[in-house]
Amino acid sequence: MARNDWINSYLEAILDVGTSKKKRFESNSKIVQKLGDINSKDHQEKVFGDMNGKDHQEKVFSPIKYFVEEVVNSFDESDLYKTWIKVIATRNTRERSNRLENICWRIWHLARKKKQIVWDDGVRLSKRRIEREQGRNDAEEDLLSELSEGEKDKNDGEKEKSEVVTTLEPPRDHMPRIRSEMQIWSEDDKSSRNLYIVLISMHGLVRGENMELGRDSDTGGQVKYVVELARALANTEGVHRVDLLTRQISSPEVDYSYGEPVEMLSCPPEGSDSCGSYIIRIPCGSRDKYIPKESLWPHIPEFVDGALNHIVSIARSLGEQVNGGKPIWPYVIHGHYADAGEVAAHLAGALNVPMVLTGHSLGRNKFEQLLQQGRITREDIDRTYKIMRRIEAEEQSLDAAEMVVTSTRQEIDAQWGLYDGFDIKLERKLRVRRRRGVSCLGRYMPRMVVIPPGMDFSYVLTQDSQEPDGDLKSLIGPDRNQIKKPVPPIWSEIMRFFSNPHKPTILALSRPDHKKNVTTLVKAFGECQPLRELANLVLILGNRDDIEEMPNSSSVVLMNVLKLIDQYDLYGQVAYPKHHKQSEVPDIYRLAAKTKGVFINPALVEPFGLTLIEAAAYGLPIVATRNGGPVDIVKALNNGLLVDPHDQQAISDALLKLVANKHLWAECRKNGLKNIHRFSWPEHCRNYLSHVEHCRNRHPTSSLDIMKVPEELTSDSLRDVDDISLRFSTEGDFTLNGELDAGTRQKKLVDAISQMNSMKGCSAAIYSPGRRQMLFVVAVDSYDDNGNIKANLNEIIKNMIKAADLTSGKGKIGFVLASGSSLQEVVDITQKNLINLEDFDAIVCNSGSEIYYPWRDMMVDADYETHVEYKWPGESIRSVILRLICTEPAAEDDITEYASSCSTRCYAISVKQGVKTRRVDDLRQRLRMRGLRCNIVYTHAATRLNVIPLCASRIQALRYLSIRWGIDMSKTVFFLGEKGDTDYEDLLGGLHKTIILKGVVGSDSEKLLRSEENFKREDAVPQESPNISYVKENGGSQEIMSTLEAYGIK
């Protein structure tokens, strides 16, 4: 019955909390009644605040929640049942008895609900494992079917070994062997490479000096990592410029420096042609508001367009400086975390350059951990952390990434292994096939490499590694007259907490987060009397002014720490300063080292553990969690002990062992200093650039060119200089690539020159795309219920062209038609409705997989086809997609190939109405599990599925044209309906202006976009954007013109 006594006491505590709250509220209400209008709800909320409101919940710790969680998590249903029986047997007419019975029922219900959540989660994980195994088996069968009999035998008999690339090995006397297929980066022969590298870290507060690490959950170790990486890469021979892109923040809540567009991180070395490294701040979202990372998702397209403008500008400028006028495109685009990974994926696709990803912290791993705890439902997890949106961003990043940089092997196996887009077994098989020169049948897996983060050793003084005796008496004595050296201010701030500051210091440095497990450390220290007698504890937990003003999660951790200090009476033994500068962190490490102390990282899970490396550099032995990256760090440095973060006794034993055993302490210090070079930034950069260069060998070189635009529009001209082809050909008339033979070339050249002279000054002249000042894009998905293009497209186009003529006049605005239909379908419908396609500068067809130019005899853009073909499975996708598209068996003619719309870059499938097909997110998931990377779009009112290359889409095609023609996306106007194909959301976000025409779309395909369990539209598209306007139903050219004028287009 002891367990039931605990339950009874918890229930009584809940009743007491509820009663006291009610009494306090009633008392306050009486006071207000005397003061004024108690019937005014607004007045009550003004005086008290909303008792159930979000702000109130963030500021006040809930005892009820604590006791309920204890009951639900600590006891089973039988205990709750016994308690309920007891309550029923002893109940009476008192209100408290009835409330107790009611609480029993409610908590019993919560316990059963938790049990159901755990059960559902187990079923979900089991189903997912089966699907992943099926995907891998399908891929292996397809791959095996293409091998010859001899190759099959060899494949069956060969025992494959793990080939995960790592640069983190146990200490050896010789250098680790470099694999033969990868050459180590040598600075001697790379000095003339002039590489341009782009790093992206979107969220948090990013600046080069006085970093506010720990200010909030978004400003942590990742900020320091990316800043130091940018500096280190810029100091590497062969690297010309490094840009670190982040979000511009002009909010009064933060320092003005976060609103500066450009910040130089490092100056180029003297006598060098290098440009150095810079922080580039890109505006996105509300510029005067600090937006946490969970709310940044709708603003990613805007960041992509802004970043693209910057990169194109820098590429052009660098090309003029050092490359004879030819643009220098980024050598690699590296995204950090899920949001920046998605940005990098879009940029890499638009520019056709390699992309690298570093996850830092992974959403799926966090999601599974939260579900296992059982304290919060799946819906609440997604509502709080936007976890489904984050996971999809990570999957998209895996699709596009050439390489994924990890800190440890554990991150590969236990974290990335949870994702649809990475299967370590399939990745090994594909790598073996590539080495043998055997086709992978369009399947692809990113390469995982382990490259530990580097450290900036510039703050480490020579004496930090030379002084074996760290006695504080050499610096501070009991009398101020004994001070021999200047004392760092942070030392005084810390030592004021201690009754004896000379004792060894146990140092913990992290943000106040539940995951960092600081409370367990305080408990371990408080309950170990020998440790308390021997050492002091220093807790550096970010910066704060008032605990009440901190985020809820941080304030709860700090309050718990303060309560534990009081509970164990640790006054004079624990320091917890309110403020510290980033520049003072080295002094904090020095203080611990000079007192012969220990650094501890007791986090529940630590992805890497950069602070452990920093501590080792200052000669501090370490105690670290055994979960995650510290395992590899301790293995490499051999300078400390690993512990179970849940075991208080193990933590106190490890700390006591290192502090009390002087010989062990000295040995750990010596080993750490000896092996720390393995984590230097130069070593990190050499390994990083070696792997990037290896990955670039299989990535096509970008041939993207930018049309040169004359400074002044001195005359009218043809559409494009390519239209007057000066290339010779042995073929007659036009060849397949648009070249002319000698005779035709001469005739066209003469005609063109004559036309230019005759049309000079004529108002009806047509400017080239490179001379357009704006672009108007018609992307209305107007279909009837049968998937046929509606005739109202004609009226939409005419209204748009007329409005353009009324605002800016002919020639200044170019027109683009973007559709999910094939070229032939577009031609048929426009001819039927007497639309002149030559009014358009480009036609984007088949959901963005093809671009045609009407003014060049409808010639296809072959460069764009090459631009998007990388990772395109081609013919290999046909049989797989036909197997996967239906949710249940279908008749043979229900799902058929739509041959007239198929092309080299688009596989079109016709879907009969009423057939149950998988949604886009489900299909994409199953293709990822099989190593196939594609973009999937339902169009024509969900009667057709277009399977196109990964980097192809309508929005990416328009970004491609924007780069080629030198027209910023901010100078582009999209005309859309209120709904459309499943890529409709992609067209809403970004720097471009959007005019939504009401009532023009009949049937759409968006019901097949994603399942109810996935993220919602508000997580992908800004709900209130100044760039989106509406034109009422049946609105004509005048209404469109008025909307354009509201955008400042006149």
Swiss-Prot record:
Family: Belongs to the glycosyltransferase 1 family.
GO terms, biological process: sucrose biosynthetic process
Protein name: Sucrose-phosphate synthase 4
Keywords, alphabetical: Glycosyltransferase, Phosphoprotein, Transferase
GO cellular component: cytosol
EC number: 2.4.1.14
Residues annotated as signal peptide: none
Higher taxonomy: Eukaryota, Viridiplantae, Streptophyta, Embryophyta, Tracheophyta
